[in-house]
A protein has these predicted regions:
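Sigma70-family region 2
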Residues: 26-27, 35-51, 68-71, 157-159
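A short, charge-rich alpha-helical start-of-domain segment used by transcription regulators
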Residues: 1-18, 28-31, 48
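Short, small-hydrophobic-rich alpha-helical interface motif
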Residues: 16, 30-41, 54-57, 104, ...
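Short amphipathic alpha helix immediately N-terminal
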Residues: 112-128
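Solvent-exposed, charged amphipathic helical/linker segments at domain boundaries
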Residues: 132-135, 141-223
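Internal acidic/polar
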Residues: 72-94
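Amphipathic alpha-helical segment used for protein-protein interaction
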Residues: 11, 86-117, 167-168, 176, ...
Length: 327
């Protein structure tokens, strides 16, 4: 691999990871796709359009993995949720449309066929034209349009985004209410038809079915808040998949990520990722200092002092790089 060739790949790396993560909903799998794309790039001769070539290779690798993942996820214990990633300025903002990164959107993408998901991600996440998508997927332009249309019908129209400052304020109120086991405060924050999902993957204790309705979710949250294990837990707010989320630490280790979704200023969905395998990527990001700053704007938080403040924003950290991987 020449220095120029490696430089071309490194320039494409963040985009390839972003594409693969949106396609798969799994950060570790996305890293594997980037590594495999690099190995193929290493063996390829001169490429006329490196970005298009790498995008096509990564997309095809994702399509292959999605086919096997569907069967694996059908056998998954309890609800399957994507792997959370800590986000902030950096690679996540090189994509014109950030909405496709949202945790709730990644959940909805599970309804799609692999080809529909590819068409949706390429169009919504990377602003590819239908003609370009057709070329990348090896289908006609009419077929590409149809794939995208079906995907959009399944996913629905983009919801009106809750303004970031207001969203963060509600998440912080939710954190305070949870910490104090404040029943009236929690009740005011929950929508009538709120749903709570928990993904333990059979590796930790978690509800295996969604909990629906304000009364049931309220009991569920109060049970969590009063659980002896959480009495000594540490909580913080950090940007996950582009939006504020609640992070829970036990004995200094990340043990849960709670991702809220809002409708009309109230919590309508609460998605709890508890499976330690799915928390590994976010935990590694946090250990590299990607947890943002104190709420008063002072020095960045480190793993040893998460409990002392709320993380209000994040910075993208790639760490030491190896060819074909996101550090």
């Amino acid at each position: 691999v020449t220095a120029g060739s490696l430089e071309q790949f490194e320039a494409a790396r963040p985009r390839l990871f972003s594409l693969a993560y949106r396609m798969l909903g799994e950060a570790a799998e996305a890293e594997d796709v980037v590594q495999e794309a690099y190995l193929r790039w290493e063996k390829a001769g001169p490429v006329a359009t490196p970005a298009a070539w790498l995008t096509r290779v990564a997309t095809n690798l994702c399509l292959t993995r999605l086919t096997s993942a569907r069967a694996r996820r059908e056998r998954y214990t309890g609800p399957w949720l994507p792997e959370p990633v800590v986000t902030g300025p950096g690679p996540w903002e090189t994509v014109e449309q950030r909405d496709s990164l949202r945790f709730g959107v990644l959940v909805l993408l599970e309804r799609l066929t692999p080809a529909e998901r590819a068409a949706f991600v390429l169009r919504e996440g990377f602003d590819y034209s239908h003609r370009e998508i057709a070329s990348l997927l090896g289908v006609s332009e009419a077929n590409a349009r149809q794939l995208y249309r079906r995907a959009r019908e399944h996913v629905g129209e983009p919801r009106k985004r809750f303004e970031a400052p207001a969203q963060k304020e509600v998440v912080e109120r939710f954190l305070t209410a949870m910490h104090q086991a404040d029943l009236p405060a929690l009740e005011r924050l929950l929508a009538e038809d709120v749903v709570a999902w928990s993904d333990g993957g059979g590796k930790v204790s978690a509800a295996r079915r969604p909990i629906t309705g304000r009364a049931k979710v309220l009991r569920f949250l109060l049970g969590l808040a009063r659980h002896p294990r959480l009495a000594s837990a540490e909580f913080t707010v950090a940007p996950v998949n582009g939006e504020p989320a609640l992070l829970v630490f036990e004995s200094g280790a990340l043990s849960a990520v709670m991702v809220p979704e809002f409708t009309g200023g109230r919590l309508s969905e609460i998605r709890n990722v508890l499976n330690p395998d799915k928390l590994a990527f976010a935990a590694a990001q946090l250990s590299n200092g990607q947890a943002g700053t104190r709420h008063d704007g002072s020095r960045p938080l480190k793993p040893s002092n998460f409990s002392s403040a709320l993380a209000s924003s994040g910075t993208s950290t790639t760490g030491p790089k190896r060819p074909g991987s996101r550090g």
